[in-house]
Structures are given as structure tokens and as C-alpha cells.
Amino acid sequence: AIIPNIEEINAWLGGGENTVIRSTYRPAIAEFSVLRSSGSGVNKSVRLDMHPHAQQRQYSIHGFLDRSNFQYVNPQTRRTKTYTFTSTKALAVGAARKVLSMGTTAIFAANKRGNQGAIGLAEELIKQLEYPLALPNPVDYADIEALRTRIDYLETEFGAGWIGARSLRNGAVLHHGDIPQETREVLEELLRDRRIQLVICTSTLAEGVNLPIRSLVLYSVQRRV
């Protein structure tokens, strides 16, 4: 597990400098990438720059996200429309949906509320799913039967309109520090058992929890107060 205050815990257990074990070992290869935008409005195109650091092998995936991913046909007018995808929030959610087929994906936000918060990301996801966009739907990667009892639990505890319950109905876990511990454990179990493949979270999820996350989308990294 990831322990952010290992020195304090070591001291509390009566240990010394030599009793803290540090290792650079990683059980899996970590690959880094950055979204780079060009153009504006509906003509915006986003490429994925893999290994953006100079000392690593670099390559780009052009057109990783563009207008084609956000177009849909209006059922009333039968005209093709484009969902607004110019915001960083829309692109973060779109990128996470794009890589869902690779495995469990997390979208990280430094805050739970505000313009750069996890709750806003959950609202953006739900908004996107109201339209038939050409992006993977999280529900298609979830165990619907397993979700049903958890959705009932969340709706009973917090109400059907709570953003966490609405997120789970749409195939995503919302996880942050204001959610009671016992509820977080229920949600973490879904991720651990691979019953769901999308989670929107803050640093609370990383503290003391090992989960099978394949891709991590960093939406915001600076905590605002």
C-alpha cells in the first residue's frame, strides 16, 4: 500500500532510520504522455505525445481526440452536431473514456469541489453520456448485476440525486474524502474486483489502497483552498 507518512508511522512503531525500507522497484512499467491541442473550436484536434521527456523514446498519436469523437446526430432534426469539447475538463473525461478498453482508468483531481474538482468531472461525464458520442461508454465495461445492489445502497443512504449515485448508475465510481469510510470501502471493492473500470478520485483513493488501475488521467494536480 502507499503510505504518505511512513516516517511518522515508523517512529510510532518504535523504529529507527534503518527500519524504513525504500525501494525503486515497480511491478509494472509506467508510461507517461501529454495531451497537446491544436486548432480551436470544433476544429480542435488533440494528439497524445508519449514519453514527452527528452531522454525517453518519443512518439505521437495524432487525432487521439478530435471532432469525430464528439459528434452526434440530433434525433429531432437528424442533423449532425458537435458536443463542445474545448475545455480541459471535457478532454480529460474524453481521454479517460478513450482508453477504457485497456483496463481500469482513473481520472485524478486535486480537489473534490470547484472548477478543478472531482465532482465537476463526474458532472461532465454524466453530461457527455446524455449524447451518443463516439466514445466508449463506462457502463459497457461494468458488471451491471454487481452495480445494482451498490446503487440501491447509495440511493438509500444519500438519495437518488446524489452525484455519487448518479455516477455509479453511469458506470463510474466517484471517490473523495467527504464520502464516509464504509461507503468508500464498498466502492473500492468494486474496483478491486474489476466490477467497474472508471473511477473519478482525489488523493484519498491513493492513500493505503492497492487497486488494479491501468491508466491515470491527471486533470488537476495543485490543491486549491
Question: What are the language-model segments listed below?
Answer:
Residues 13, 220-225:
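Short, intrinsically disordered, charge-balanced linker/junction segments flanking boundaries
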Residues 208, 216:
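Conserved P-loop NTPase nucleotide-binding/switch module
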Residues 25, 204, 221:
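Short, ordered loop/turn segments at secondary-structure junctions
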